[in-house]
C-alpha cells in the first residue's frame, strides 16, 4: 500500500505529480489592467482529459465552448474533455484558484512553461503530443 501525498498549504505548490492520475495546483493571477482580457491559457481542448477550477479568491471568466461563465470565490468550473476552453481574470484584482487536472494536462503545462520559444508551430506540436489541440 502506498502512502498518501500531503502538501503544506498549497500557496503556489502542487499536490501530485505527473505520476499520479490527477494533480491539484494552486495558481494566482495578478489581475488584468484596463483593456482587452489577457488570456491565462489560449483557446484549446483536451481530447481525453477533463479540467476544473475552484476559485479561492477573486474572479475568473471561463469560456466553455461558446458560453462564457463568471466564477467567483467559492465556485468551481468543470470543462469536460473535448470541449474548447480558455480562461482569464476579468478584474484588476488578483485571483487565486485551484486547478484540478489530469497528469497529462499537468505535463502539457510543464512542457509549455519549459519552452524557450513559444512559436505557434511549437505550441501546436506540444499540444498535439499531449492529445490536445491549440485552437487559436
Q: What does each model-found stretch correspond to?
A:
Residues 48, 67, 83-84, 93, ...:
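A generic "binding-loop/recognition-motif" signal
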Residues 41-43, 64-69:
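Short beta-strand segments
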Residues 3, 18-20, 66-84:
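Short acidic-glycine-tyrosine-enriched beta hairpin
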Residues 90-136:
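Double-stranded beta-helix
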Residues 62-63, 79, 85-91, 97-99:
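Short beta-strand His + acidic residue motifs that chelate non-heme Fe in jelly-roll/DSBH
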Amino acid at each position: 500500500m502506498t502512502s498518501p501525498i500531503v502538501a503544506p498549504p498549497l500557496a503556489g505548490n502542487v499536490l501530485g505529480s505527473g505520476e499520479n492520475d490527477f494533480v491539484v495546483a494552486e495558481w494566482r493571477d495578478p489581475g488584468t489592467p484596463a483593456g482587452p482580457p489577457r488570456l491565462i491559457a489560449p483557446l484549446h481542448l483536451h481530447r481525453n482529459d477533463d479540467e476544473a477550477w475552484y476559485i479561492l479568491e477573486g474572479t475568473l471568466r471561463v469560456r466553455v465552448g461558446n458560453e462564457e461563465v463568471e466564477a467567483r470565490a467559492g465556485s468551481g468550473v468543470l470543462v469536460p474533455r473535448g470541449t474548447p476552453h480558455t480562461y482569464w481574470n476579468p478584474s484588476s484584482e488578483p485571483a487565486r484558484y485551484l486547478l484540478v487536472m489530469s497528469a497529462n494536462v499537468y505535463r502539457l503545462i510543464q512542457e509549455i512553461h519549459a519552452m524557450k520559444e513559444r512559436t505557434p508551430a511549437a505550441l501546436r506540436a506540444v499540444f498535439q503530443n499531449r492529445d490536445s489541440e491549440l485552437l487559436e
